[in-house]
């Protein structure tokens, strides 16, 4: 796979046995254990479908926790839109869970928000919580806001992914990516699954993981953070700014920054200079490069994978392949939801499997 991602697949083909394999999404709700990642009532194509759906779980050593980024599902990643998915809430204790491997993120975020009186809005990161390590662009936002109290949670129930730790809250000055935690069930325990080397080692191979990926930090200034009157400015230098719009891609902002410097359009006085971009300017550059890298699509897919099978009517099968671990999924409705739900909430029923004469039979407990 080279250095294009963290997750490395075993090269040998997996043994075909049974279909009792699932990607289990960890969600911090105690009343149900959801299964699968859903966007707009459609499942998303992922490499996970291609290699985890061929075997059964026989040992907890086969479970591997992986962080999956929301941006692969097509969420808007611009700062004005992304920050609307987060909000302050009091009386809810934060939760942290660790994960073993993750994706490369195109967009990460770093917040440093204060109240008008100078007090901090966000808590300091606990010991051991570090920046998300694989970010192409880090959107660093600093400024002020009313911060009504409590901690900053994700309104849609997702996690904030840090370096091998996922939290339900945002920490001050610590880079994160939005995502969820999934458990992969591997065909068998493999110690080298997440550490297998690339097929072709680079000539200048180094042990520093950060050297594999170039990170660009984009700075913003915000006023009235978290309110209906929030105003964002893209920061060129300490006196030169650009009025931020949701249509601006990271690639456009990088080019805009270079243009302002090369054309000598920065503030040449002691006063603040704020530019506004002409509405006719095309700002969509770079988006397709991102999607080609993620290898995902916003369109529904019809691949017969173990996740997409959840939406098909159950067929009559032998005992070895009868799906006893799932209850029927609720029918899809066209009613608009106020907030998106990233999880398909299907209750999970525990089952016990026995192997006799090379045949596996499973029954619910």
UniProtKB/Swiss-Prot annotation:
Residues 1-32 form the signal peptide. It comes from the Viruses. The record marks 324-325 as: Cleavage. One of its GO terms (molecular function) is channel activity. Disulfide bonds join 108-135, 121-147. GO terms for biological process: monoatomic ion transmembrane transport. InterPro entries: GPC_FiloV, GPC_filovir-type_extra_dom. Keywords: Cleavage on pair of basic residues, Disulfide bond, Glycoprotein, Ion channel, Ion transport, Secreted, Signal, Transport, Viral ion channel. GO terms for cellular component: extracellular region; host cell membrane. Pfam families: Filo_glycop. Glycans are attached at residues 40, 204, 228, 257, 268. Belongs to the filoviruses glycoprotein family. This is Pre-small/secreted glycoprotein. The lineage of its organism: Viruses, Riboviria, Orthornavirae, Negarnaviricota, Haploviricotina.
């Amino acid at each position: 796979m080279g250095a294009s991602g963290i997750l490395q697949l075993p090269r040998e083909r997996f043994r075909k046995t049974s279909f009792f394999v699932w990607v289990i999404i960890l969600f911090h709700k105690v009343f149900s254990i959801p299964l699968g990642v859903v966007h707009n009532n459609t499942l998303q194509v992922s490499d996970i479908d291609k290699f985890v759906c061929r075997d059964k779980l026989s040992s907890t050593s086969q479970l591997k926790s992986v962080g999956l980024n929301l941006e692969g599902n097509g969420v808007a990643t611009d700062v004005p839109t992304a920050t609307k998915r987060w909000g302050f809430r009091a009386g809810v204790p934060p939760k942290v869970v660790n994960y073993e491997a993750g994706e490369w993120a195109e967009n990460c975020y770093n917040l440093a928000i204060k109240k008008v009186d100078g007090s901090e809005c966000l808590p300091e990161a606990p010991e051991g919580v570090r920046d998300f390590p694989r970010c192409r662009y880090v959107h660093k936002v600093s400024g002020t806001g009313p911060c009504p109290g409590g901690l900053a949670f994700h309104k849609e129930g997702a996690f904030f992914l840090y370096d091998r730790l996922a939290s339900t809250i945002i920490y001050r000055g610590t880079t994160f990516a939005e995502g969820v935690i999934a458990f992969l069930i591997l065909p068998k325990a493999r110690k080298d699954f997440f550490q297998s080397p690339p097929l072709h080692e680079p000539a200048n191979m180094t042990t520093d993981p950060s050297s594999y990926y170039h990170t660009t930090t984009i700075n913003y200034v915000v006023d009235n953070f978290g309110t209906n009157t929030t105003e964002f400015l893209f920061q060129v230098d300490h006196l030169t700014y650009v009025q931020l719009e949701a249509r601006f891609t990271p690639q456009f902002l990088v080019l805009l920054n270079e243009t302002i410097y090369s054309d000598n359009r920065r503030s040449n006085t002691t006063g603040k200079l704020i530019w506004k971009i002409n509405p006719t300017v095309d700002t969509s550059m770079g988006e397709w490069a991102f999607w080609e890298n993620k290898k995902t699509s916003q369109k529904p897919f019809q691949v017969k994978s173990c996740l997409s099978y959840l939406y098909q009517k159950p067929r009559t099968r032998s005992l070895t392949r009868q799906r006893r671990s799932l209850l029927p999924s609720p029918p899809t409705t066209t009613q608009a939801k106020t907030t998106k739900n990233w999880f398909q909430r299907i209750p999970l029923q525990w089952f016990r499997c026995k192997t006799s004469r090379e045949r596996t039979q499973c029954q619910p407990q």
